[in-house]
Regions:
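Short, structured coil segments at secondary-structure junctions
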Residues: 33, 55-56
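Short, well-formed alpha-helical segments that are part of the catalytic scaffolds
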Residues: 17-31
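Short beta-strand/loop segment that forms part of the nucleotide-sugar
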Residues: 26, 34-43, 60
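Acceptor/aglycone-binding surface of glycosyltransferases and processive sugar-polymer synthases
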Residues: 63-81, 86, 98-155
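Acidic helix N-cap motif at the loop->helix transition within catalytic regions
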Residues: 20-23, 46-54
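Cell-envelope/extracellular polymer assembly enzymes that use nucleotide-activated donors
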Residues: 8-10
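A conserved acidic beta->alpha catalytic loop
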Residues: 41-49, 94
């Protein structure tokens, strides 16, 4: 059982060609906050799959590259079919801090159906985390477009 809640919390690591950061990611994750962690390698061309097998994760390699969205859908479906109450997406490239799940504890206890976070609320990841400018810029443009289109607050 995880140390956050009596709900089953599974992590799903989404990976493509990330062998050079997997060990750092593993060391960064507080393993006790999850009941289970799946690692989904999206048919990487490097040794990501082999590196991930060295850790206490359930490692799955796609036979074809599904793209980020397809890999994520497969991972979430697998986790829920395996009994997860909540699933946390973890990017293998370390661009998101997986330990921020502690911030969601109260929402988990209140049985929220969806909990989402933003890395843009209190900081600028382009400056503070070395996010590529094009990625940062496109995220901001799409968020602003979605805010206008749906009349909702996004960061």
């Amino acid at each position: 059982m995880n140390k956050i809640s009596n709900k089953k919390i599974y992590g799903v690591v989404i990976c493509y060609n990330s062998e050079h950061v997997i060990k750092d990611l593993y060391n960064r994750i507080d393993q006790e906050m999850f009941d289970k962690i799946y690692f989904f390698d999206d048919n990487s061309r490097d040794n990501s799959f082999e590196v991930a097998k060295g850790f206490d994760w359930h490692v799955i390699k796609n036979q074809t590259n599904l793209g980020h969205g397809g890999n994520l859908k497969k991972a979430i479906k697998t986790a829920f079919l395996d009994g997860a109450d909540y699933v946390l997406e973890i990017h293998a490239d370390n661009q998101y801090n997986p330990n921020l799940i502690y911030e969601a504890k109260n929402f988990i206890e209140q049985d929220y159906a969806l909990i989402t976070g933003s890395r843009f609320v209190n900081k600028n990841p382009y400056i503070e985390e070395g996010m590529p400018f094009l990625r940062y810029f496109s995220n901001k443009v799409m968020s602003n477009f979605t805010k206008k289109l749906l009349s909702i607050q996004l960061t």
